A protein has these predicted regions:
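Active-site-proximal beta-strand elements of phosphoester/diester hydrolases
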Residues: 229-232
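Glycine-rich beta-to-alpha active-site loop
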Residues: 123, 128
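N-terminal beta1-alpha1 cap of cysteine-dependent amidohydrolase-like domains
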Residues: 1-122, 133-140, 144-181, 188, ...
């Protein structure tokens, strides 16, 4: 059992969802909480979608986030059924598309601030799309409608093992962060997304693409002072049973523990 004091605090991004009875909930899927707790060995802390409370006052929001990041050792950006509102990258939304304005207004500025402060960042599915948009890139809103692209959406099965089953291989960029972590140039991943990277953000580096159609599957940020890895697939699903997923969570965990140790050093000196 890992002692609580040695577990890094990992902020987990939440969505804002209507509960069907006129109320609203800040929600995080259990699989992300379990991944932060068990696969990354951390203590998960929910980051509520509070961006709208600050309106257009981004400096005030970032001041609030600074207080949060001062206490966090890592940030995990979760997947979601909702999509980033396309006005953030100069496009219009299609009727019927599910969005989460509160999450967008929280995560997009938080991503830039987290990266620039060197706080370890691990982004999954929607999280990858958020990283690309936050840093100036754009998205395909419907990858399956792009000529030459496969359908990256999952089956709609009541059996989650079917939905999260291996779907296609990815080609891992030579010499990149992902190859360094996995020691391989090709692995098989699941696929549960309708949107995907269109124009790559200037600061981002492609770490992997789908072998079948070239769609971006992983990103890093080479000029970031800390760990940044964004994945289009879902390594959190039954992560403890998947060696590839565990290598990725191990790397994130190591970065989080290093930040925990660095944060603890000044406090120990102050106590002497």
């Amino acid at each position: 059992m890992i002692r609580p004091s040695s577990r890094p605090l990992i902020g987990v991004s939440a969505c804002l969802k209507e509960n069907g009875r006129g109320g609203w909930h800040h929600t995080v899927g259990e699989k992300y909480v379990q991944a932060a707790l068990r696969a990354a060995g951390g203590l998960p802390v929910l980051i509520p979608a509070i961006g709208p409370e600050f309106g257009d006052d981004e400096p005030a929001f970032l001041e609030a986030m600074d207080r949060l990041l001062d206490s966090l050792d890592g940030v995990l950006l979760t997947g979601s059924p909702s999509n980033v509102e396309p006005h953030h990258y100069g496009k219009e939304s299609r009727e019927g598309t599910l969005h989460d304005r509160a999450r967008d207004s929280t995560t997009l500025p938080l991503i830039r601030h987290t990266i620039d402060r060197g706080v370890p960042l691990f982004a999954i599915c929607r999280g990858l799309q958020e990283v690309n948009v936050a840093l100036g890139g754009s998205l395909h809103q419907h990858v399956h409608e792009v000529e030459g692209r496969r359908d990256h959406r999952s089956p709609k099965s009541p059996d989650m093992d079917v939905n999260y089953a291996p779907a296609h291989d990815i080609d891992i960029a030579e010499g990149g962060l992902l190859q360094q972590l996995l020691g391989e140039r090709r692995v098989t991943v699941n696929s549960l997304h309708a949107q995907g990277v269109d124009v790559l953000a200037p600061r981002a580096r492609i770490e992997a693409t789908c072998c079948e159609d070239g769609q971006v599957e992983a990103l890093s940020v080479p000029d970031a002072p800390g760990f940044v890895l964004a994945l289009q697939w879902h390594p959190e699903y039954k992560a403890l049973e998947n060696p590839v997923s565990m290598k990725l969570f191990d790397a994130f965990a190591a970065a989080c523990r290093a930040r925990l140790a660095a944060r603890a050093t000044p406090m120990l000196r102050a106590a002497e």
